[in-house]
Amino acid sequence: MKFEEKHRPKTLDEIIFVDAYVERIVKETAANKRHKHLILHGPRGAGKSETANLIMKGRYAEEDVNIAKCSVHASALEDQSLDILTGNWNYQRAFGMLHGCLVIEEVDQLKLGMQQTLRAIVDEHTFGIIICTTNNLHRIDQPLQDRCRCLEFTYPTVDQWLPRAKAILDTNGIFLTEVQTQLLLKGFEGSGRKMMDWLEDTILDFTSNKSEFDQLLEVRTGT
């Protein structure tokens, strides 16, 4: 199994939210307390796609719904009718769902005409919600934005990464103190994908030559 897949967040509690308000809206939507359309926007690797799919799974955790039918990339929608949206919602409601739910990845890749059609569909059909992701909020039709709650995702700081990074290191047999882990991550800036690369490198350094890793750790952490 790929390292990134092995340590992919399994629940929303494993997602690192920079903004407490965003965390609240996300978790309340996943718990079926909110039913407004969402646009998760921000830079690549900020956790938007993981969050969108975990919201969807949270809404249907107790139901027998094929999650694979609930997520689509915008580029795939360019080659077919947006009827897939209401079709998926109806499929989900056939299993007893009050509201259908579909994740649309990179929704900004829809041409303007398709975005306007999408807006008309969500206006007409109130029995489902869409959860969209984008790296480019400015490319999304403003009236479509107005029908959604737009939540901004940004990169966590090293301090915010600390608990998750330490847990991953622990799982792989590298037991460091919080101070050591923080110093090990010193200087890191970047996305969740870059963090996974960083941690994988650290773990491979440890497993390939523990003595050299210990020396590296002493240099990097000052221990």
Question: Where are the predicted features?
Answer:
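Pre-Walker A (pre-P-loop) alpha-helix and adjacent loop at the N terminus of AAA/AAA+ ATPase modules
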Residues: 1-43, 87-94
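Short glycine-rich substrate-engagement loop in P-loop NTPases that contacts/grips substrate
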Residues: 20-23, 66-100
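Walker A/P-loop
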Residues: 30-71
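Conserved AAA+ ATPase "SRH/arginine-finger" region at the nucleotide-binding site
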Residues: 73-75, 149-162
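Conserved catalytic/switch belt of AAA+ P-loop NTPases
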Residues: 90-91, 104-146
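Helix-loop-helix "sensor" segment of P-loop NTPases
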Residues: 158, 162-182
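C-terminal helical "lid" of AAA+/P-loop NTPase domains
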Residues: 182-187, 193-207
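Conserved C-terminal helix/linker of AAA+ ATPases
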Residues: 199, 203-223
